[in-house]
Design a protein with these regions (language model features):
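Amphipathic alpha-helical interface elements that mediate macromolecular binding in regulatory proteins
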Residues: 1, 16-19, 37, 41, ...
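Metal/cofactor- and membrane transport-associated sequence elements
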Residues: 1-98
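Mixed-charge, polar/low-complexity N-terminal
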Residues: 5-6, 11-12, 52, 88, ...
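A generic structural signal for short, solvent-exposed coil/turn residues
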Residues: 13, 49-51, 91, 105, ...
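Divalent metal-binding acidic/histidine catalytic loops
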Residues: 26, 31, 35, 57-61, ...
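Polymerase palm active-site segment centered on the conserved acidic dipeptide of motif C
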Residues: 50-53, 77-123, 133, 224
């Protein structure tokens, strides 16, 4: 690879020459892709299959065991149904790549993981408490629900304007929390609709979510070890519930046995003329 000479550091004798790159000070933009291709090639050659929906998920399904590896840039989380296979995988990876181990997973990308004999509990308790503290609501009264059932938000054209930066910062922080908190997915989706021109009424309402979190920071997802593998899906909608344009909002979730594995809350793109049409 060749690069141009840095400005003001050109060689006076060869100003038009280029330099051959020995090592990039802060890495190259191609590095992540090269690393991913290198790791993918290694895993596929050893019997792993890459996920279709998640291209960073690799699964090795043998007759006697199951080994799963989840890749996030240069961090790899893996586990197996047989402990010896996980240990063997770790040793093989160390031979091929320079890497370090942190033993049992307890914290990953702000996710706190508690592993017990009965199952695994995933939460974002530390992150939730930081949100409450960040926006100065740790001393405020807790809210029993994330959104009011008696008052519906609207554009509020005549309302008092508030800082869009502050409002968007709250929405962004809360959206990241939905990774382990499906109970606030709908309410955040509703409040996120008013980021373009937030009013005081919107800010008061979105702070209610934070006050709700302040009372429930330790909520999370429990994945039972003894649950069956039956997949079940549920969905519903609130027909024409948006005051501004009468569009409906769809909600859905999927359970693998007793364990919640996927959920969504999304405003529909068009107006439905009946409940049946919305569904």
């Amino acid at each position: 690879m060749f690069v141009e000479q840095p400005k003001r550091f050109e060689d006076p004798h060869f100003p038009d020459h280029v330099m051959r790159l020995k090592k990039a000070l802060y890495g190259l933009k191609q590095a992540p892709r090269v690393w991913y291709d290198r790791l993918t090639h290694y895993l596929l050659n050893r019997g792993f299959k890459r996920g279709y929906a998640d291209r960073t998920l690799f699964v090795k399904n043998d007759k006697t065991y199951l080994l799963i590896a989840q890749v996030y840039v240069d961090d790899i989380v893996f586990g197996a149904t047989i402990d010896d296979r996980a240990i063997e995988f770790s040793k093989e990876m160390k031979k091929e790549f320079e890497m370090s181990m942190v033993e049992e997973l307890t914290f990953f990308l702000v996710l706190q993981v508690k592993q017990k004999k009965e199952g695994i509990f995933v939460s974002q308790e530390k992150y939730a408490r930081n949100i409450v503290k960040k926006f100065g609501l740790n001393s405020k009264k807790h809210a029993s629900t994330p959104i009011s059932s008696s008052t519906k938000l609207n554009v509020d054209s005549s309302g008092v304007e508030v800082s869009p930066t502050l409002y968007r910062s709250i929405i962004g922080s809360l959206l990241y929390l939905t990774t382990s908190r499906p109970d606030i997915a709908f309410s955040i989706g509703v409040h996120a609709r008013y980021q373009a021109a937030p009013k005081e009424s919107h800010l008061i309402a979105v702070k209610r979510i934070i006050r709700y979190i302040n009372g429930t920071p330790d909520y999370g997802l429990w994945y039972s070890k003894d649950s069956n593998a039956c997949l079940a899906g549920y969905s519903n909608e609130d027909w024409a519930c948006s005051v501004d344009d009468r569009k409906s909002t769809s909600g859905g979730c999927f359970y693998l046995g007793n364990n919640l594995v996927s959920w969504m809350s999304k405003k529909q793109n068009s107006v439905s003329f009946s409940t049946a049409e919305a569904e």
